[in-house]
Amino acid sequence: IKEDLSPVAYQWLETADARSLLDWTRMNRVLPENNGIITAVRGENEKKVLFEYMLALDLKVKRGEYADFIRAITPLGVDLLEIVLEQSCDIDITRYYKRNNQRIWDKNRLVGEILDILNQKFYPFRYGPVYSAHLLEIIQKKCTDTLMVQRIQELVNIEQNVRNVAAHNIVSVTPEWIKERTGKSVDDIFWILKYVCEQVKINTRKENWNSYDSMNKRIIDELDKD
């Protein structure tokens, strides 16, 4: 296929493929320069990585890959809740984790008020992996933005209602299946995710949500030139 396309068209196709797979190293290498649509994604830029993850989730929905969409909510949820704690509650929750970027509670570091909050709900608190339900409990006790707390509660409820079923059982995950188990449509769920992202400034420009559409239009334009 490479021989049949202009270098720019092929660059864009490779960029789109790498982007949809969240392969930033490859995407950054083949990305057309100064293209006005996408800029390089660096792993240390957490908000940009999360925004690209959100766009990839939107792509899964558009492709009808609902099981993948549901499974992807869990890691994204914990990421978002950590940022909410930092920005809305002024708590760097990672201070209570084991070192080396592990999402595991550290018995020596998790002390004081945060441990008290977790013990109230999960007595006796057993440490181990960090779950969104743990972070939700802290947000409910420490954040004053009631609407944000409500949205986070909805998000964690959705995750808990569908995660285990979709992960451990052979089921056909459809929009109807999701609505039946969560009370929310796929669009509702994505709207909640977008709301949280915008509140914590993961994305501040609404047109950025159409980035994949802009990229696809550019690809079509380049292919039409060939």
Task: Locate each region found by the language model.
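Charged alpha-helical initiation segments
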Residues: 1-66
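A structural signal for well-ordered alpha-helices, especially hydrophobic packing surfaces
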Residues: 19, 54, 58-61, 77-84, ...
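Intrinsic-disorder-associated interaction segments
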Residues: 43, 74, 107, 128, ...
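Amphipathic alpha-helical interface elements
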Residues: 43-131, 217
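Solvent-exposed, low-complexity, intrinsically disordered
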Residues: 130-139
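Charge-enriched, short contiguous segments at helix-coil
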Residues: 141-211
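Acidic, carboxylate-rich catalytic segments that either coordinate divalent cations
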Residues: 202-226
